[in-house]
Amino acid sequence: MKIAVACGGTGGHIFPGLATADILRQRGHDITLWLAGKDVETPAVKDWAGPVVTVQAEGLPSGFSLRAVRAAWRLLRAARACRRIMRPNRPDVLLAMGSYASVGPVCAALSLGIPVVLHEANVLPGRTISLFSRWATAVAGSFEETRFYLRRKDIVVTGMPIRKELEKAARTIPPHETGRDIFTLLVMGGSRGAHRLNDLVSAAVIQIHKGGHRIRVIHLTGVADEATIRKAYQDAGVNAVVSAFEQDMAPIYAAADIAICRSGASTCAELLDFAVPALQVPYPEATKDHQMVNARAMEKAGAVDVVPERDLSLPWLTDYIVGCMQTPGRLARMSAASRSRAMQSAAESLASLVIQVGNGEYGRTV
C-alpha cells in the first residue's frame, strides 16, 4: 500500500508522524513523508531513508490583516502544488498530523478522492483538524476528551505516538522507585525554553539545598538560560546536571522522582509512558491556551498537579517541592495513575487505523 504521511511544521508533529511512518514501513508499506520546508524538519528526518516531498507552507495568523491574506494565498498555492505532485503518485491513504503543514496535502487528497486520516495531538483540536475533520474518513486523537471539542464524536483514541527509541525504553526500563537516597527533580521548559520557570525553580532548588535537604536536579533550560542556570547551581554547590536540551530522555525520565514542565502533547505522552509524576506549568502563550486544557485532563486523571505560570512564586514552589520530597507515597500514586492512562502502543494503533482506512475496511461491520 502507498501511504502519504503529512507531518511537517514542528517537532510535535514531525516526531509522532515519523514514529507512525516507521511502523507502517516495518509492515511492508511504501511511505512518503510530506513536509513544509522548516529548519526543524532537517535534523528530525536525517535518518529517514524513504521519499520526502517538501512543499513550502506557513501558518495562518489569527484575525484579518495583510499578513493573514498573504499567508492564506501561500496556503492556497501550496495546496495546488500538493495536488499537482500527488495526482500522478496517488497514495492509497493520507495520514495528516495536523498544523498548517497538513493543509496542502489534505486539500489535495480530498480533491482527488483519497481517504484521509487525521491525528490530533492535543485535547483541544487545532484549526486544521477542526476544519477538515468533517471530511476525513477517520479522526484519531491522543486524548479521550478531544471528542467534546469536535462535531463528530467517533474519535479513535490511539494515544500520542512518541519517538521509537523512547517507546522501546518505556517498555523495558523498570518502573521508577520513589523514596531513594537522593530526591531527583527534572525541570523542562519545553522547546521554547521558559525563562521565568528556569529562574524560579533554580532559586527554589538552591533554597532547598541550603536548608539541608538532599536534592539533585536535572535541568533542561533551553539555549538562552543554560550558562546562567549552570553557574547559579555551581556557585551554590547544588548537585545539578544542566543542559540546553537532551536527545536521550529515557534515562532522565527513569531517574526523576518528579518533573516540573510544560504540558505540550509530546511531553504529556512521555510523562505517561514513563509514569513520571509532574507539576505542569502550561505555556501561557499557547494558542487558545491549549496547554492548560491538556494539563487539566492530566490532572483529572491524577497524574499531575497544575499551576498557572502567573500563580508561581518562590515560597509556593519551595514548599511544593519539599512537600513532594516528604510524601513519596503521593508521588507513587501519581505514577500509578500515569501508568494506567498511558498508551504505549500509540504508533502501532495509529498505523493499524491508517491501514484499515487504506484497505477500505474502516467502519465496516461483519
Where are the language model's segments positioned?
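An amphipathic, basic-hydrophobic alpha-helix
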Residues: F64-V93
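C-terminal alpha-helical cap of glycosyltransferases
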Residues: M343-V366
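An aromatic- and histidine-rich active-site surface loop
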Residues: D39-P43, P91-L112
